[in-house]
Amino acid sequence: MSATPLVSQVDSHNPEKSKLIPPLLGASVAELSAWVQQQGQPAYRGKQLHEWIYDKGVRSLADISVFSKQWRAEVAEIPIGRSTLHYRSVAPDGTVKYLLRLTDGQIIETVGIPTFAERGEGPKARLTVCVSTQVGCPMACDFCATGKGGYKRNLARHEIIDQVLTVQEDFQQRVSNVVFMGLGEPLLNTENVLAALKSLNQDIGIGQRSLTVSTVGIRDRIRQFAQNNLQITLAVSLHAPNQALREKLIPSARAYPLEELLAECREYVEITGRRVTFEYVLLAGVNDLPEHALELSKCMRGFQSHVNLIPYNPIQEVDYKRPNRDRIEAFVNVLKQQNTAVSVRYSRGLEADAACGQLRASKN
C-alpha cells in the first residue's frame, strides 16, 4: 500500500475531502489521525505520530519505533520537514545563532536567547526564539543587515516551526517565547505565519501571549491580521516619528503613509483588545533628538501602545552609530514626560552578529 501525502487541512466530519500535501511538521493531531487512517492505520497512531514529531523530535518516519517495520518502510520517504544545521555560534551572554540549511539549499538564520536567573547562574528562566519568515527580506531598511542580501522566497509553515524545535532540542529546554523578528517581513507571508502561530500554540504548547509578530507595516495587512482575533503581541517597526524621515530609513514607507499605518494600529487595538508595541531603533544624530521623541509621543496618543527603544547595533555596510547613554536617557525622559509607555531593549547576541538588525544568514 503506497503512502498518501499529508493531510494539511482536515474536515473532521469528512477526512477524505481534505487537501493532501506534505510535509508533516505543522500538522495537528486531527490532521495526522486522518492521514494515518488513510494509510489503513488506527486513528490513535495519529496521536503517537504527533508526539514523536513535536516531543521526541524525530526527523524520519523510519525512526518511529512504535510503528511496524513494514509501515515505516512504506512511509519512509514522506518528509517530516526538518532542516539541517549549517553553522552555530555562541555569544558570551549565552545567545546562540543558528544557520539552518533548508531542503532546497537556502540558508536561514535563527537565534536562541536564554534568560538566566538573577545572578546569571542556575537554570534558564526563559528561552526565547527569534524566527525568520522569509529567505532574505524585500524591505531593504537602510540600517538593517537583513535586507542587504536580497530576497529569495517565503518560508513554508514547517520551515518556521522547525526553527523553534531546533533551538528547543539544542538547549534541551522548552521554548517559552517566540518572536517573529528574524529574516523577512512576516505580513508578506501571512498564510504561513498564521499557520505556524497556530501550531506553535496548539502543537508545541506556547501561549498566544508569548508569541510576537513584528512588521514594518504593509498596507491593509495589520487590519487583516486583526480579523483572526489572536492574543499575540503585534510589534510595529516604526523607527521614525514622521513620514519624511521614515521614508529615508524604510523605502517601503513611501507606499504606506505613517498616518494610515497608525490608523490600522488603532483598529488592531479596537478589534483585539491588545496593545501595539512600536519598535524604534535609535540612530545617533538621525532620529534620537528630543524633538523626535516629542513627535513620537504624539503618534502614540489615543490608543494602547508601548514604545520599545532599541539602541542601534552596528553593521559593516552603513555608517550609522549608536547614541550614547545620555542621549538615550534624554529621549526616554521626553517620552515619560508625555506619559508615553516606554522601555529600552539592549539587544542580546551582539558578539555573534545575532542582535536586532544584524541577521543576514551568513557566518560573518
From Swiss-Prot:
What PROSITE patterns does this protein's entry cite? RADICAL_SAM
Where would you find this protein in the cell? Cytoplasm
UniProt xrefs under InterPro entries = Aldolase_TIM (IPR013785), Methyltransferase_A (IPR040072), RlmN_N (IPR048641), RNA_MTrfase_RlmN (IPR027492), rRNA_lsu_MTrfase_RlmN/Cfr (IPR004383), rSAM (IPR007197)
Cofactors demanded by this protein: [4Fe-4S] cluster
Q: What is the main EC category here?
A: transferase
Kindly report the protein's main subcellular placement as a broad class: cytoplasm
> Which reaction is recorded as catalysed by this protein?
adenosine(2503) in 23S rRNA + 2 reduced [2Fe-2S]-[ferredoxin] + 2 S-adenosyl-L-methionine = 2-methyladenosine(2503) in 23S rRNA + 5'-deoxyadenosine + L-methionine + 2 oxidized [2Fe-2S]-[ferredoxin] + S-adenosyl-L-homocysteine; adenosine(37) in tRNA + 2 reduced [2Fe-2S]-[ferredoxin] + 2 S-adenosyl-L-methionine = 2-methyladenosine(37) in tRNA + 5'-deoxyadenosine + L-methionine + 2 oxidized [2Fe-2S]-[ferredoxin] + S-adenosyl-L-homocysteine
Q: Where is the Radical SAM core domain?
A: 123-351
- Please name every pair of cysteines joined by a disulfide bond in this record: C130-C356
Residues bound to S-adenosyl-L-methionine are G184, E185, S214, S237, L238, H239, N313
Annotated cofactor note: Binds 1 [4Fe-4S] cluster. The cluster is coordinated with 3 cysteines and an exchangeable S-adenosyl-L-methionine.
Q: Where is the active site?
A: E109, C356
So what EC number does this one have?
Answer: 2.1.1.192
Under Gene Ontology molecular function, one entry of this record is: rRNA binding
Question: What is noted besides the main data?
Answer: Reaction proceeds by a ping-pong mechanism involving intermediate methylation of a conserved cysteine residue.
PANTHER family, A to Z = 23S RRNA METHYLTRANSFERASE, RADICAL SAM CORE DOMAIN-CONTAINING PROTEIN
Q: What is stated as this protein's family in its record?
A: Belongs to the radical SAM superfamily. RlmN family.
Task: Spell out the HAMAP family in the cross-references.
Answer: RNA_methyltr_RlmN (MF_01849)
**UniProt protein name:** Probable dual-specificity RNA methyltransferase RlmN
Q: What is this organism's lineage?
A: Bacteria, Bacillati, Cyanobacteriota, Cyanophyceae, Nostocales
